[in-house]
Curated annotation (Swiss-Prot):
InterPro entries xrefs: Chalcone/stilbene_synt_C, Chalcone/stilbene_synt_N, Chalcone/stilbene_synthase_AS, Polyketide_synthase_type-III, Thiolase-like
Keyword tags: Acyltransferase, Flavonoid biosynthesis, Transferase
Entry protein name: Chalcone synthase 1
Catalyses which reaction(s): (E)-4-coumaroyl-CoA + 3 malonyl-CoA + 3 H(+) = 2',4,4',6'-tetrahydroxychalcone + 3 CO2 + 4 CoA
SUPFAM superfamilies with a match to the protein in the record: Thiolase-like
Family affiliation: Belongs to the thiolase-like superfamily. Chalcone/stilbene synthases family.
GO MF term set: naringenin-chalcone synthase activity
Its biological purpose: The primary product of this enzyme is 4,2',4',6'-tetrahydroxychalcone (also termed naringenin-chalcone or chalcone) which can under specific conditions spontaneously isomerize into naringenin.
Species of provenance: Medicago sativa
Pfam families: Chal_sti_synt_C, Chal_sti_synt_N
PANTHER family, alphabetized: CHALCONE SYNTHASE 7, HYDROXYMETHYLGLUTARYL-COA SYNTHASE
Amino acid sequence: MVSVAEIRQAQRAEGPATIMAIGTANPANCVEQSTYPDFYFKITNSEHKVELKEKFQRMCDKSMIKRRYMYLTEEILKDNPRVCEYMAPSLAARQDMAVVVVPRLGKEAAVKAIKEWGQPKSKITHLIFCTTSGVDMPGADYQLTKLLGLRPYVKRYMMYQQGCFAGGTVLRLAKDLAENNKGARVLVVCSEETPVTFRGPSDTHLDSLVGQALFGDGAAALIVGSDPIPEIEKPIFEMVWTAHTIAPDSEGAIDGHLREAGLTFHLLKDVPGIVSKNIDKALIEAFQPLNISDYNSIFWIAHPGGPAILDQVEEKLGLKPEKMKATREVLSEYGNMSSACVLFILDEMRKKSVQAGLKTTGEGLDWGVLFGFGPGLTIETVVLHSVAI
């Protein structure tokens, strides 16, 4: 008779979880950051708030963002004037948009990832869908299953309202699924859209204005699996270790609340300080077992919540400017896309590594770290190992 231990052993994969393919997608509507304050104050009928507009212009100028992509066009906003007010009841209108566009943009990214993977979609065994944009039943995971024509018995996981750290969360979950289910191929999708958070300016709630200066729309998809099939599946990164922690004394640093007026965000001024204060401990826990203490010797993928967070992390750890190059590039070209950001950075890094003729997908280095920061204040850590190009 076969023992439970033997059954469990047979169910597990042999090797580490690997990222086998990456796809990204954005709405067609591109917004230039330099002209966004004019558009934003005009469409929200707030042009009379001259001092506030000047303050918002300075926020945009300091954001290090060149452009963002947004589903919300001038035409859509004119058709939904209550979305343009600061706290007008508008949840139904926001939800009606989000439940359609979130899975649709996720599909665009997923199709690209599946194409790069090169295997039939019938081999997908698990689906993880993550969004902070809208809530519905059945969820965006169900809608994507239908849009892609996946098998009805694909094992689905729907993650709502996680926020900006969730790019790390989906990798942690995908790693566990791939390594504990032999032959599993996990489709991971993060799709984020701004209809739930867009609103007019407020003189008294400047943290809301910070979000309006930073957030953009985007979706990213990955195929994750262990024991890649030789000559058919080509891993891009290996996921070696993950951790999840709540930073001490950080309650209320970042939080969001779903109200009749949509999803409202609240930020403390010292979020960059809280992140930089706690990142050293996270790195020691992750890299001490590998005998790595020089954090300039690894590649970096950090959620770009804003330039201040990246600046303080660099200063705290003495990082060279090039360490955050891929992260800053994604922030510049797309803005803060919440959970999707770190997956965009993974894609950016592996592409630039190939273009530059480097020896590995991690900027020529072997080891790297991926950080997600978000509500809680929650920190997700993923230790990555690059793959030879």
